[in-house]
């Protein structure tokens, strides 16, 4: 197999990535039937942006393989495969307005309000392992009883990322970026994605 990443955010992707992991899992389960593939991904989401770009790459490859009948498997096995690649890969199988519960269930909602979002990605990232190691108290799960209101503006504005204070205390430059964005007149709210 050959895996190629192109696009402005392709430079920092190593040989071990979600696509290579997925291919290895599919081969180990003999789902590819010794077929070889050239896979080309145009990377449109920055690496380590906390937006699940790598997970969605893998999910798109799975969707393609299933749609083209390259792999044949059960829904149960497909769910297991996505979990082996990454916990949020399953969201990419049908990603619009989807909430992944902490108890492995998925809820989907239709006709949710759309927002204009500005994404700011500094030229550095944080180690997820390091950031989580500094958490002293975990918040209670917020998505175990999801409903459509979770996609409303007021609900989203009240939400927070528990990891954000840890990251902001570590990176002074990021505090300045957040402060600047908060001061903009038409900015409704700012939020860090993922673990920084």
Roles of regions detected by a PLM:
Residues 30-38, 64-85:
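Phosphate-handling active-site elements
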């Amino acid at each position: 197999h050959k895996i190629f990443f192109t696009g402005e955010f392709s430079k920092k992707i190593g040989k071990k990535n979600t696509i290579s992991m997925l291919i290895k899992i599919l081969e180990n389960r003999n789902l590819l039937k010794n077929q070889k593939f050239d896979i080309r991904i145009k990377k449109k989401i920055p690496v380590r942006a906390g937006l699940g770009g790598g997970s969605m790459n893998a999910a798109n490859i799975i969707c393609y393989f299933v749609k083209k009948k390259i792999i044949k498997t059960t829904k149960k096995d497909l769910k297991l495969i996505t979990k082996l690649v990454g916990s949020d890969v399953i969201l990419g199988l049908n990603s619009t307005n989807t909430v992944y519960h902490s108890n492995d269930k998925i809820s989907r909602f239709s006709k949710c309000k759309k927002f204009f979002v500005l994404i700011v990605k500094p030229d550095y990232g944080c180690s997820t392992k390091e950031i989580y190691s500094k958490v002293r108290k975990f918040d209670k799960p917020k998505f175990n009883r999801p409903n459509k209101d979770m996609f409303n503006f007021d609900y989203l504005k009240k939400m927070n990322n528990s990891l954000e204070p840890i990251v902001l205390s570590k990176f002074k430059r990021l505090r300045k970026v957040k402060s600047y964005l908060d001061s903009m007149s038409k900015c409704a709210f700012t939020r860090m994605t993922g673990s920084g």
